[in-house]
């Protein structure tokens, strides 16, 4: 895998390069781990407010609708039974919390695994900027993205203070935009290409490099 990545200038061409740290962009892509983390993330997004009434909760009389024998019909004990129209639901749904506990190291490993896969597949890109002045321009953003990534689903990663670029790409149908500190395994894995601005890339690498070095130091101290 290449250890550097060309930085694309707003007007096209190369504007230098950036290093791809092996600790971030050359990690094992553990598919079962990524699946587990993505499933947990989607489960946590569920509201879990579903509720249906059981036979003990629906309105209706508790008396026997007709006598036990002599009518020719099947015996019934209540109009609130599930087989009746307006009766309660069998195994009624109750509000519940779908969130799963996922260790932080697993979440981090899943994200690095996806980013490493995109880097190995040459689907990770860095642009110097979107070449915008003080005013947003979706047209300019589209031209740059079309030159960098031609896939149907593109993830754009920006810095939080880059409001002009954010406003320029947020309404594009095939583009999903995140800030560097929001990057996660799900949004990365459902995107065909990932496009960083150089400022966002530097911020992301700096944050992850600090986390990786801290984790390595902790494990070394634990071993001693």
Annotate each PLM feature.
Residues 53-91:
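Glycine/serine-rich anion-binding loops at beta->alpha junctions
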Residues 1-47, 92-224:
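Extended polybasic, low-complexity segments that bind anionic RNA or targeting/receptor surfaces
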Residues 48-52:
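A short, aromatic/hydrophobic, helix- or strand-capping loop or linear motif
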């Amino acid at each position: 895998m290449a250890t550097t990545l060309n930085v694309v200038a707003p007007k096209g061409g190369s504007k230098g390069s950036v290093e791809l740290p092996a600790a971030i962009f050359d990690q094992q892509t553990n598919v079962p781990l990524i699946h587990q983390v993505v499933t947990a993330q989607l489960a946590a997004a569920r509201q879990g407010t579903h509720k249906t009434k059981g036979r003990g909760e629906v309105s209706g009389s508790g008396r026997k609708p007709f006598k036990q024998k002599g009518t020719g019909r099947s015996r019934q004990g209540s109009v609130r039974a599930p087989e009746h129209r307006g009766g309660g639901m069998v195994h009624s749904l109750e509000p519940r919390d779908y969130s799963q506990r996922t260790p932080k190291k697993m979440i981090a490993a899943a994200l690095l695994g996806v980013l490493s896969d995109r880097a190995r597949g040459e689907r990770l890109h860095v642009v110097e900027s979107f070449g915008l002045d003080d005013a947003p321009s979706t047209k300019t953003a589209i031209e740059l993205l079309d030159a960098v990534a031609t896939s149907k689903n593109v993830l754009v990663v920006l810095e939080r203070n880059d409001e002009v670029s954010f406003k320029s790409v947020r309404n594009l149908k095939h583009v999903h935009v995140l800030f560097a500190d929001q990057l996660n395994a799900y949004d990365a894995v459902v995107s065909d290409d990932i496009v960083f601005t150089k400022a966002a890339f530097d911020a992301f690498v700096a944050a992850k490099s600090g986390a990786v070095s801290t984790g390595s130091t902790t494990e070394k101290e634990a071993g001693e």
